[in-house]
């Protein structure tokens, strides 16, 4: 007997965004400010690739992305925005949507946080344990409605043109820390490329990943760390600054690996300040040159597009695919 077809819709825009002129404007904005929407767009592209891969393996799956209201399927995942989630809730009230999932990786402003608890939302899907714990620290009742599922990363193969060069990925960190690290690398005569968030393109990043051996990652916090995963899938280990806490407006939360929720010993190591950076970096760099890290193998097993898409289906739909 043929397996029942699974039909689902991925939403990132509300119904007003289907007009061609608005979509054209949004595409221009994406090109100009890609780094500010990299997360949601990256998640959408990952699920698209992952679902396509599962279909090729024989899973009876049909899905669409931001369709007109007449083509929305009964199962819906909202990937971006409180307005889009509100729109989806209105469709569920009209019985157009039967199962509604907020996520994965949806961000909701503090003043609209209550929309997560709307009875029409069947489940909230967050990208990491770090995000799960953070939201539970703010509201104890939310844990029963949350599940964890990361977004995957595309496998584009690895390069044979690597040099003894580092990427220093500077996203959000104190200037004093980044200055000390760059000065250290210069004194040790270690070649590096500095990438500052918002000042390069995805193509620039992919090019440098293919040319480099490892990455120093400077960021206060990550919900998941897709940029890290893109390095790992290329077999680049990461030396990540982790300051142990997150501060957002009046909220303070502490925990381990806030900057790198999916970092493992196969993928690299953390440091907490410059003193620890200076102490541990020689060992990290030598292990890198000796090939003692294996981030690509870990990423292929746990964080590929297909693996994460399959996790999402298993998690949210309670079906073992």
Where do the PLM segments sit?
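Active-site proximal beta-strand in glycosyltransferases
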Residues: 73-108, 125
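N-terminal pre-catalytic "stem/leader" segment of glycosyltransferase-like enzymes
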Residues: 1-86, 306-315, 320-321
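Catalytic binding pocket for nucleotide-activated donors in carbohydrate/polymer assembly enzymes
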Residues: 220-302
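Conserved catalytic-core segment of nucleotide-activated headgroup transferases in glycan assembly
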Residues: 31, 37, 134, 147-202
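Alpha-helix C-terminal capping/helix-to-coil transition sites in glycosyltransferase folds
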Residues: 71-73, 119-120, 210-212
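Short acidic alpha-helix that forms the nucleotide-activated donor recognition element
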Residues: 201-212, 233
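Acidic donor-binding loop of glycosyltransferase active sites
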Residues: 207-223
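A short, active-site helix/loop in glycosyltransferases that binds the activated sugar's phosphate group
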Residues: 109-114, 120-143, 176
């Amino acid at each position: 007997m043929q397996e029942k077809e699974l039909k689902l819709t991925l939403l990132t825009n509300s119904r007003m965004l289907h007009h061609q002129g608005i979509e054209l404007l949004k595409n221009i904005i994406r090109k100009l400010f890609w780094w500010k929407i990299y997360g949601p767009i990256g998640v959408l592209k990952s699920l698209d690739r992952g679902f396509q891969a599962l279909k090729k393996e024989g899973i009876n799956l049909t899905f669409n992305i931001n369709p007109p209201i007449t083509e929305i399927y009964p199962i819906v995942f909202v990937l971006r925005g409180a307005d889009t989630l509100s729109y989806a809730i209105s469709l569920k009230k009209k019985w157009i949507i039967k199962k509604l999932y907020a996520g994965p990786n949806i961000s909701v402003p503090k003043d609209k946080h209550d929309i997560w608890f709307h009875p029409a939302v069947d489940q909230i899907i967050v990208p990491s344990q770090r995000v799960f714990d953070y939201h539970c620290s703010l509201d104890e009742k939310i844990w029963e409605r949350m599940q964890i599922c990361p977004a995957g990363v595309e496998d584009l193969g690895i390069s044979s043109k690597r040099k003894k060069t580092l990427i220093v990925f500077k996203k959000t960190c104190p200037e004093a820390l980044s200055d000390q690290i760059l000065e250290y690398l210069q004194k040790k005569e270690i070649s590096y490329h500095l990438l500052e968030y918002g000042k390069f393109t995805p193509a620039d990043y992919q090019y440098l990943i293919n040319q480099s051996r490892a990455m120093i990652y400077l960021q206060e916090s990550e919900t998941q760390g897709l940029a890290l995963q893109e390095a790992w899938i290329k077999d680049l280990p990461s030396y990540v600054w982790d300051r142990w806490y997150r501060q957002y407006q009046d909220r303070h939360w502490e925990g381990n690996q806030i900057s790198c929720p999916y970092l493992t010993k196969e993928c690299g190591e953390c440091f907490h300040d410059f003193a620890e950076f200076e102490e541990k970096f020689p060992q990290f760099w030598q292990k890198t040159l000796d090939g003692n890290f294996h981030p690509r193998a870990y990423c292929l097993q746990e964080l590929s597009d297909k693996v994460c898409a399959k996790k999402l289906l298993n998690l949210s739909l309670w079906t073992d695919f």
